C-alpha cells in the first residue's frame, strides 16, 4: 500500500512469504530469485488439488511455516539462521507426514521447494528448528476495537470523515453451485476445481468445487480459502481456510483477530454455530463474510464496499474473478430450462438439459418442489435453485443451502428491494467479461488516478 520503506534489504524475504501464501491469486510483483517461483506453483497446487478427504497434512506444514515467517515475527534480512530454522521445521513436518502423502503432487512440490530454498540460503540440514509461533490474544473483555485503534482501521469512520457513505455490494455462492455476483446476476455454474471468487488489493477468496458423487457433473464447494492482506497499522496478513467437515473458528495460525498491530481487532472471527456457521468481520475495509457448512458442503456470502471491489492494480487482469465477472459462458448451466423440461416428468431427466452424465438417486419432481416450498415459499431463483439441486444431487441438505443463502442476502444486501431475484442471467457472447458498472470504461482512468492519490479505501 505504501512506498518502499527502510527495510529494503528484507524485501525479497517478505515477498517470499506474501507470494507463498497467496501465489494462486497472482499477488506480488515477481521475484528476482528463481526459488520464488516455487511458491506460486505450490500455492496453486494446494488450491487446485482438493485435500478434503486426504490424510496428507501438507496444508498444516504450510500454515506453520507461513506463520513462522510472516508478520511482526518474520526473520529480518540478517536473520538467515532463523529462516533456516524455520525451513528445517518445515522439512521435519513434511517428513512426519510423508507416509500419508505418497503421490500427492502438492507434497512433492513442497519437498523440492524446501530443498531449493535451503540450498539458496546455505542452510544446513542439521541444526535447531524454530519454535511454534504463539499468538498474543487480546486482553480479557477486549471484544471491541481497541480504543487506540487508528481511525484508518474503521471503514465507516474514515468515510464519514470525508463526508461520504460507502456503497455496499454483495456476492454469494451456494449449492450446485449457484453464484450471485456483485451486480446481482444469478448464474448456475459447473466450475469444477479451483476458482477465484474475489481478487483485489485487500482481499482474495478462492473456492474449490468437487463432484457431489463420482461420475456426476453436479459439483459443490468443498474448500474455501480467504486471504486478508497485510494492511498498514491495522492487521497482519491472515489466511482462513475451511474444508468439508472442518469449519474452523480461527485463522490457520490459530488466531482469531488481525495480529499484533494496534488495529488488530478490526479483523475478527466469530463462531455463530459450532462447525456450521462462522462470520468474519473486517472493519478496516468495511467487509463482512459469512461461511457456512450445510451438510457436507460450504456456502459463502460477502458484503463489501464497491470501493474495495474496484481497488485493483490492473483491471485487465481480473479475468476469472467470479463475483465480479460471473462464470464463463462454457461453465454456465441453464437450470431454468432444466426446470421447465423436468416439470411434469417426475424423476425422468432429459439428457440434453441435465448437467450430469450419470445422476445419483434423486427426488421425484413433486417431492423436490414440496421440500423447497417448506423453506422457500417465494418462487424466486433461490427456490428454483433448490429444486434444481434436489433433482441433480438427491441431497436434501441443498434445501437448507438455498435457504441460508437467501437469509445471508437479507442480512448483507444493502438494497432490500433486490433480495429476491426472478430472472436468471445468462451472459450473451461479448458480455461475459463485463465487470461491475461501478467503474464505467470512460471513468476508469479517473478511478485509477483516485486509487493512486488515496491509497486507503474502505
From Swiss-Prot:
Chain segments carrying region Disordered: 121-149
Lipidation (GPI-anchor amidated alanine): 433
Family: Belongs to the repulsive guidance molecule (RGM) family.
InterPro entries membership: RGM, RGM_C, RGM_N
Signal peptide positions on this chain: 1-53
Subcellular location as annotated: Cell membrane
Listed Gene3D superfamilies: Mog1/PsbP, alpha/beta/alpha sandwich
Keywords associated with the record: Autocatalytic cleavage, Cell membrane, Disulfide bond, Glycoprotein, GPI-anchor, Lipoprotein, Membrane, Signal
Topology term for the membrane: Lipid-anchor; GPI-anchor
Pfam families: RGM_C, RGM_N
GO CC list: plasma membrane; side of membrane
Any one GO molecular-function label of the UniProt entry: coreceptor activity
Protein's recorded name: Repulsive guidance molecule A
Stated role: Member of the repulsive guidance molecule (RGM) family that performs several functions in the developing and adult nervous system. Regulates cephalic neural tube closure, inhibits neurite outgrowth and cortical neuron branching, and the formation of mature synapses. Binding to its receptor NEO1/neogenin induces activation of RHOA-ROCK1/Rho-kinase signaling pathway through UNC5B-ARHGEF12/LARG-PTK2/FAK1 cascade, leading to collapse of the neuronal growth cone and neurite outgrowth inhibition.
Any one GO biological process: BMP signaling pathway
Amino acid at each position: 500500500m505504501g512506498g518502499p520503506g527502510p527495510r529494503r534489504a528484507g524485501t525479497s524475504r517478505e515477498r517470499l512469504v506474501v507470494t507463498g501464501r497467496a501465489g494462486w491469486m497472482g499477488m506480488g510483483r515477481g521475484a528476482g530469485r528463481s526459488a520464488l517461483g516455487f511458491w506460486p506453483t505450490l500455492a496453486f497446487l494446494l488450491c487446485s488439488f482438493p485435500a478434503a478427504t486426504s490424510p496428507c497434512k501438507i496444508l498444516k506444514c504450510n500454515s506453520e511455516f507461513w506463520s513462522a515467517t510472516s508478520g511482526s515475527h518474520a526473520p529480518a534480512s540478517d536473520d538467515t539462521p532463523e529462516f533456516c530454522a524455520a525451513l528445517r521445521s518445515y522439512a521435519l513436518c513434511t517428513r512426519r507426514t510423508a507416509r500419508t502423502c505418497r503421490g500427492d503432487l502438492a507434497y512433492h512440490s513442497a519437498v523440492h521447494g524446501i530443498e531449493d530454498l535451503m540450498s539458496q540460503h546455505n542452510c544446513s540440514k542439521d541444526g535447531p528448528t524454530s519454535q511454534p509461533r504463539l499468538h498474543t490474544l487480546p486482553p480479557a473483555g477486549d471484544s471491541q476495537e481497541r480504543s487506540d485503534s487508528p481511525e484508518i482501521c474503521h471503514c465507516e469512520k474514515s468515510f464519514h470523515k470525508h463526508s461520504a457513505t460507502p456503497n455496499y455490494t454483495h456476492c454469494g455462492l451456494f449449492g450446485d453451485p449457484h453464484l450471485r455476483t456483485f451486480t446481482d446476476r444469478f448464474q448456475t455454474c459447473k466450475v469444477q476445481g479451483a476458482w477465484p471468487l474475489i481478487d483485489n488489493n485487500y482481499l482474495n477468496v478462492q473456492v474449490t468445487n468437487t463432484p457431489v458423487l463420482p461420475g456426476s457433473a453436479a459439483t459443490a464447494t468443498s474448500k474455501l480459502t480467504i486471504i486478508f492482506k497485510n494492511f498498514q497499522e491495522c492487521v497482519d496478513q491472515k489466511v482462513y481456510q475451511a474444508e468439508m467437515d472442518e469449519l474452523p473458528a480461527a485463522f490457520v495460525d490459530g488466531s482469531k483477530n488481525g495480529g499484533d498491530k494496534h488495529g488488530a481487532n478490526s479483523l475478527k472471527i466469530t463462531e455463530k454455530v459450532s462447525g456450521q456457521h462462522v462470520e468474519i468481520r473486517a472493519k478496516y475495509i468495511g467487509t463482512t463474510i459469512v461461511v457456512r457448512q450445510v451438510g457436507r458442503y460450504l456456502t459463502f456470502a460477502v458484503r463489501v464496499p464497491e470501493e474495495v471491489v474496484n481497488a485493483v492494480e490492473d483491471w485487465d487482469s481480473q479475468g476469472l474473478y467470479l463475483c465480479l465477472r460471473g462464470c464463463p459462458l462454457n461453465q454456465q448451466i441453464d437450470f431454468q430450462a432444466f426446470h421447465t423440461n423436468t416439470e411434469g416428468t417426475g424423476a425422468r431427466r432429459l439428457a440434453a438439459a441435465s448437467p450430469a452424465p450419470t445422476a445419483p438417486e434423486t427426488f421425484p419432481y413433486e417431492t423436490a418442489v414440496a421440500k423447497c416450498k417448506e423453506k422457500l415459499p417465494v418462487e424466486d431463483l433461490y427456490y428454483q435453485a433448490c429444486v434444481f439441486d434436489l433433482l441433480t444431487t438427491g441431497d436434501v441438505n441443498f434445501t437448507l443451502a438455498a435457504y441460508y443463502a437467501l437469509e445471508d442476502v437479507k442480512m448483507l444486501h444493502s438494497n432490500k428491494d433486490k433480495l429476491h431475484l426472478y430472472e436468471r442471467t445468462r451472459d450473451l457472447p461479448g458480455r461475459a467479461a463485463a465487470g461491475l458498472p461501478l467503474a464505467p470504461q470512460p471513468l476508469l482512468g479517473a478511478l485509477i488516478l483516485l486509487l493512486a492519490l488515496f491509497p486507503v479505501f474502505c
